[in-house]
A protein has these predicted regions:
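Acidic, metal-coordinating catalytic segment for phosphate/diphosphate chemistry
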Residues: 1-19
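Conserved beta-strand segments that form the floor/walls of ligand-binding pockets within enzyme
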Residues: 2, 29-30, 43, 75, ...
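Active-site donor-binding loop signature of nucleotide-sugar glycosyltransferases
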Residues: 5, 33, 46, 102, ...
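Residues embedded in well-ordered beta-strands
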Residues: 19-21, 27-29, 97-101
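Conserved Nudix-box catalytic region and its N-terminal flanking loop in Nudix hydrolases
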Residues: 23-65
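Unchanged
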Residues: 49-75, 80-137, 141, 170-172
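Charged phosphate-binding loop/patch that engages nucleotide di/tri-phosphates or the phosphate backbone
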Residues: 140-172
């Protein structure tokens, strides 16, 4: 974008952001935002990457800062482009949002550990709260998580596993 007043070019490069899909017992960790944009809406733990910070490191840091949980960051879920704010300050801030699956490392309890977080909750795929922050991409991220939950292998019962392991008796 070129400023008409000073004829200076301003680049609207996407700012890298990282987030984590932390699940426990089939439920997903979400945080309620305490500040604009999207104050009061539910979001995944995440935020902007620090200069020269790898998105995996940023995802783990953001989870720790927002919830006090230590996580092991796993596979990438996907990347989405969006705007940081719907309008007003920050509306021109384009973001590249990179999401990872993550698992809890340790036994620590969640607690809002940041002024950016008003509340923390664990939600089943069919009971995700509303409103959601960042409607330009978060619903798609959550849909990807739900689809992965539906594809995940379900543990079979001990009886059926045992039956599969038995070798049939030979017939003579």
């Amino acid at each position: 974008v070129t400023c008409r007043a000073c004829d200076t070019s301003h680049w609207l490069d996407a700012k890298p952001c990282a987030g984590a899909l932390v699940s426990r017992g089939g439920k997903l960790l979400l945080v309620r935002r305490a500040h604009e944009p999207w104050k009061g809406a539910w979001d995944l733990p995440g935020g902007f990457c620090a200069p020269r910070e790898h998105p995996r490191e940023a995802a783990a840091r953001e989870v720790r800062e927002e919830t006090a949980l230590e996580v092991q960051v796993g596979a990438i879920v996907g990347m989405w482009i969006d705007s940081y704010a719907p309008d007003g300050p920050g509306a021109d801030k384009v973001t590249l949002n990179i999401y990872f699956n993550a698992t809890i490392a340790g036994e620590n309890e969640t607690r809002p550990d940041s002024p950016d977080v008003a509340e923390i909750g664990w939600f089943a795929a069919e009971q995700l709260p509303q409103p959601l922050a960042f409607p330009g991409h978060l619903p798609e991220v959550l849909q990807a998580w739900r689809a992965a939950q539906e594809r995940a292998p379900r543990p079979s019962s001990v009886t059926s596993r045992t039956a599969l392991l038995r070798t049939p008796e030979p017939t003579l």
